[in-house]
């Protein structure tokens, strides 16, 4: 059944790509792809405690509907409603928190508005939700990493689109989950079939989120051209999710989105920087870094940042952040 479902998704994507000029047809097919993604990526909870955690994550914090929760958990609508009642879980406003809220992204709701054909089967183990200070259930989804490139080719991709070197070899990566810590920190580690290890650590602070990526070369050869894509998706951030790049800018390592009302900002940065860019179709922000060349047995690291700002002097805020990051 799974193979058949994947085949249907691939047919839909092929139709979308072939119908570039037929905007309405493409939008319809892309919406079907998003629904198929959620069904395939349903992850049943391993225990009652895990079920409660994920229901709280989805409904209390993300504000998921019963339908979205069912898609993410694999439960029926009736089972979702029964468990929400048993655990007394309901949506709660996330405005006015003392510090930023960071949670694993739960799947069930595609993190993009558009260009869905370029992100089939989004994997939840690379994605975190960082909640803005301004909305009841407003958040950005950070894909860390979305993709890792090297001299070997596309070495890792956090969804299905362009085949990776391991896809071409017929090798499948197992599903993982974020490790959750009492202070809100999330971390994860993945081992690739050729021995490369990489991982991410994401730490919530009062007014920003610190991020780190690391990679260890477990191969016998030098790894070069280690470019990384880290994507900040804006679909669920009210005031930032218009499909345009007119509200986006970059300065040094900073990629920045401005709200529709003009005085709220989402700021992200990674160093050392490879390039900053944006995609209006998703919509999303990128501050994409590059690891230094990595010898066999060596570990290399990257540092990242995400914060929110309300005010009219974005230049001064970037200077403040730069000082804070250097301390």
Indicate where each model-derived feature is located.
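Short, amphipathic alpha-helical "recognition" segments used to contact nucleic acids or chromatin
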Residues: 48-63
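A contiguous, surface-exposed recognition patch within enzymatic or periplasmic domains that forms
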Residues: 124-126, 132-138, 144-147, 218, ...
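Bacterial N-terminal signal peptides
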Residues: 7-22
């Amino acid at each position: 059944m799974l193979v058949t479902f994947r085949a249907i998704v691939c047919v839909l994507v092929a139709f979308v790509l072939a119908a570039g000029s037929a905007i309405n047809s493409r939008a319809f097919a892309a919406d079907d792809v998003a629904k198929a993604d959620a069904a395939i990526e349903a992850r049943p909870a391993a225990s009652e405690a895990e079920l409660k955690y994920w229901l709280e994550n989805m409904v209390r914090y993300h504000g998921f509907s019963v339908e979205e929760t069912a898609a993410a958990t694999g439960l029926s609508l009736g089972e979702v409603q029964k468990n929400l009642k048993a655990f007394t879980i309901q949506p709660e406003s996330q405005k006015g928190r003392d510090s930023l809220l960071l949670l694993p992204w739960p799947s069930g709701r595609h993190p993009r508005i558009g260009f869905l054909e370029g992100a089939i089967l989004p994997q939840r183990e690379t994605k975190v939700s960082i909640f803005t200070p301004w909305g009841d259930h407003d958040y950005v989804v950070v894909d860390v990493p979305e993709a890792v490139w090297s001299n070997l080719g596309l070495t890792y991709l956090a969804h299905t689109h362009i085949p990776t070197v391991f896809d071409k070899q017929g090798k499948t990566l197992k599903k993982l989950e974020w490790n959750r810590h009492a202070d809100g920190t999330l971390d994860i580690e993945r081992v690739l079939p050729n021995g490369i290890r990489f991982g991410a650590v994401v730490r919530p602070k009062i007014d920003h989120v610190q991020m780190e990526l690391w990679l260890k070369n477990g191969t016998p050869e030098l790894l070069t051209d280690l470019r990384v894509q880290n994507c900040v998706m804006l679909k669920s951030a009210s005031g930032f999710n218009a499909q345009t790049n007119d509200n986006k800018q970059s300065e040094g390592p900073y990629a920045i989105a401005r709200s529709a009302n003009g005085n709220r900002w989402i700021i992200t940065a990674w160093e050392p920087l490879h390039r900053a860019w944006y995609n209006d179709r998703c919509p999303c922000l990128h501050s994409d870094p590059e690891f230094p060349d990595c010898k066999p047995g060596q570990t290399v690291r990257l540092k990242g940042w995400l914060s929110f700002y309300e005010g009219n002097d974005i230049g001064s805020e970037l200077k403040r952040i730069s000082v804070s990051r250097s301390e």
